[in-house]
Regions:
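Catalytic beta/alpha-barrel core
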Residues: 14-28, 42-51, 70
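Active-site beta->alpha loop and helix N-cap motifs at the rims of alpha/beta catalytic domains
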Residues: 1-23, 150
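Active-site-adjacent beta->alpha loops and helix N-cap segments on the catalytic face
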Residues: 1-5, 22-38, 52-57, 76-91, ...
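Glycine-enriched alpha-helix->loop->beta-strand junction motifs that scaffold or abut catalytic
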Residues: 10-17, 36-43, 61-69, 119-124
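Glycine-rich beta-strand-to-loop/alpha-helix junction loops that act as flexible
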Residues: 103-108, 126-128
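Short beta-strand/loop segments at the ligand-binding rim of alpha/beta enzyme cores
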Residues: 36-46, 94-105
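Catalytic cores of alpha/beta
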Residues: 51-62, 97, 108-124
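Surface-exposed amphipathic alpha-helices with a cationic face
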Residues: 11, 33-37, 87-98, 145-152
């Protein structure tokens, strides 16, 4: 299918940003950035607690859209809360004064984790919890969204 055809299809569908988790930043810069920009498509880069400051600043300088702050190296899904170490990570990134907005993802499932994430970021990404609610309400997105909003 190819990356350019993918970007073209995204643009035709109204998609303006994608996450390609296993795409190394250097490969993006060298092989994909020009094509993505041609279709006004943002490639969202992920950072983790293990990503060093130099790499974070490099990502911030060469991308737009937002930076996806992965809350942990664990798999996505519900967490009861964010411990002090994760809070310190969120604060450290906030204090870097990046030009891109920062969104926290992985483990956002309730008001407590949502509020904790938003206290040091521009917002939170809720994936697994939303999929769980879609399954619960048999694909009724409106019911799932209503329930999710009540939870938060």
């Amino acid at each position: 299918f190819g990356f350019e055809a993918f970007c073209r299809k995204c643009a035709e569908c109204g998609i303006d940003g994608v996450i390609i988790p296993d795409l190394p930043f250097r490969d993006y810069e060298k092989n994909y950035k020009t094509i993505a920009l041609k279709y006004d498509l943002r490639v969202i880069m992920l950072i983790t607690p293990e990503t060093d400051e130099k790499r974070i600043r490099e990502i911030d300088a060469h991308t737009d859209g937002f930076i996806y702050m992965v809350s942990s190296a664990a798999t996505t899904g519900a967490q009861k809360d964010f411990d002090n170490r994760k809070q310190a990570y969120f604060k450290k990134i906030q204090d870097m004064n990046l030009h891109n907005p920062r969104m926290v993802g992985f483990g956002i499932s309730n008001k407590q984790t949502f509020d904790a994430a938003c206290s040091h970021a521009s917002g939170a990404i809720i994936g697994s919890r939303f999929v769980t609610l879609l399954n619960k309400y048999k694909g009724d997105a409106q019911q799932a969204i209503t329930h999710l909003k009540e939870d938060l």
